[in-house]
Amino acid sequence: MGLRRTSWMHFSALCRRAPLSTAPAAREQPAAGPGAEPVCGPAETARPPVPAVDFGNTQEAYRSRRSWELARSLLVLSLCASPALLARHEQLLHLARKLLGQRLFNTLMKMTFYGQFVAGEDQESIRPLIQHNRAFGVGSILDYGVEEDLTPEEAERTEMESCSSALERDGCGVSKREKQFQAHRAFGDRRDGVTSARTYFYASEAKCDSHMETFLHCIEASGGASEDGFSAIKLTALGRPQFLLQFSDMLTKWRRFFHHVAAEQGKAGLAAVDTKLEVAALQESVVKMGIASRAEIEDWFTAETLGVSGTLDLLDWCSLIDSRTELSRHLVVPNMQTGRLEPLLSQFTEEEERQMTRMLQRMDVLAKKANQVGVRLMVDAEQTYFQPAISRLTLEMQRRFNVERPLIFNTFQCYLRDAYDNVILDVELARREGWCFGAKLVRGAYMAQVGYEDPINPTYEATSAVYHRCLDYVLEELKHNARAAVMVASHNEDTVRFTLRRMEELGLHPADRQVYFGQLLGMCDHISFPLGQAGFPVYKYVPYGPVMEVLPYLSRRALENSGVMKGAQRERQLLWQELKRRLCTRSLFHQPA
């Protein structure tokens, strides 16, 4: 079994047209900011005034819903708020299935939890709901919600095998990856603590191809449903998670080395985008550490790759991984904990290289299909130990496909401490290289899955502050760059109000379709539908699939309503208020129109 040192070529060749570099011409482009001219913005035309949005007007908020649907929502959300019920919900579901039989159990679920949170069993059966929501200004993001029914033990075993290299599994090598990028049994079942996302486990290359086909069907359906559709994918569905772990480890070490050298040059504590290293001093440090020879170093740092300023920032530094393909095969960096030099890139077998290539090809197929049918493709965020790789691979797709409009959207998890720095760096890179920035901002669904130095904010309030800070920065960018766009994926009413206020202050009109809103089906209709009816682009994540196969998804919906979604109590109050209003006005048989 031959071993190869993987090179960046495998990642870059399939994901982009040209090497990541920061040539002088690109650096001379003026950064967007106050006073800058909009980039390729739409012609100024008279636009209608933006209607006021009232989330407390239940008659308008729920005019798309029949009374029995409101009663179901009130019942389901109230049950989800019961800690005693939630603690035993799996046992209760099992008991109900045993007592009622499969057919009656399916009927009960469709009348309650399934009907609330899932659109239907297949793309044909969900079409009426999609068309109904669109008539009231709400689009759909299709999400095939089926998960494999694995026991915790099976999930743990599958994850441990798919996150380890052949050498590690055979006991022939010791992992050089840092702790957070190694496989740990304690986190083997990635479903634990995840409240709002479908989880994929690697089974085989054929299974990954099947996941790709499912994503392709969703992209095609979204393209046919509207002229401004969205679709979402997860990279863990497309290949072995081992590659994401190893790539994340490499990127993290490379970035950490940059900050180590910055500290040596007395520049610790500066914002990531403002930290600039003196190239001459950096060259001396690299030679002293034995990372490369002086001749190799001189070949690294040239005017062609870094400009003529004599300094380089974190974006320049990360670009060196791309442009130094041959040297990266032998690249080593010092382990800041042991002091020893270690290979930056891990060893792959020939079979592992083929699997990695197939993963990147699947990403490429999906991006091309989205581009072909005009659907925006959102790459969902996942666990922190996968996220550096996911973000970087998404960025490579953005370089290639976001040339004319923001087609590929990266996801930023604002519960992470470095979320704001990551947003700033990606916006700056898009400015330099001239592609369209696209982002989805979320608070985060993986807060319980850490186990090392805590990368998350300490409280929900701290996360909300970071979310608003990131959102405000992106909205400022949108004001000066008409080719950028953002999806505000939040159930938090205060966050949505904050967005609307800042849009008004910055002159961002909903007709420009730069700011999108997203919520889950069955949750926060009092936010989604008033926005849609007022002309704001808003979307529901619409899961679908057979009843029994989406039960894991439904379990997490129930858990989310109990804790994460703080607005559930207000939503129940509004539902009850509207039912009482209809009862008092004799309009219980209200028909949406």
UniProtKB/Swiss-Prot annotation:
GO CC term (a single one): mitochondrion
Alphabetical UniProt keywords: Acetylation, FAD, Flavoprotein, Mitochondrion, Oxidoreductase, Proline metabolism, Transit peptide
EC number: 1.5.5.2
Main localization, broad class: mitochondrion
Catalytic function, reaction form: L-proline + a quinone = (S)-1-pyrroline-5-carboxylate + a quinol + H(+)
GO biological process, one term: proline catabolic process to glutamate
Region (Disordered), start-end ranges: 24-44
Pathway: Amino-acid degradation; L-proline degradation into L-glutamate; L-glutamate from L-proline: step 1/2
Class in the EC hierarchy, top level: oxidoreductase
Molecular functions per Gene Ontology: FAD binding; proline dehydrogenase activity
Subcellular location: Mitochondrion matrix
Pfam families in the cross-refs: Pro_dh (PF01619)
Required co-factors: FAD
N6-acetyllysine: residues bearing it: K368, K479
Family according to the record: Belongs to the proline oxidase family.
Protein task: Converts proline to delta-1-pyrroline-5-carboxylate.
PANTHER family xrefs: PROLINE DEHYDROGENASE 1, MITOCHONDRIAL, PROLINE OXIDASE
Name by which UniProt lists this protein: Proline dehydrogenase 1, mitochondrial
Originating organism: Bos taurus
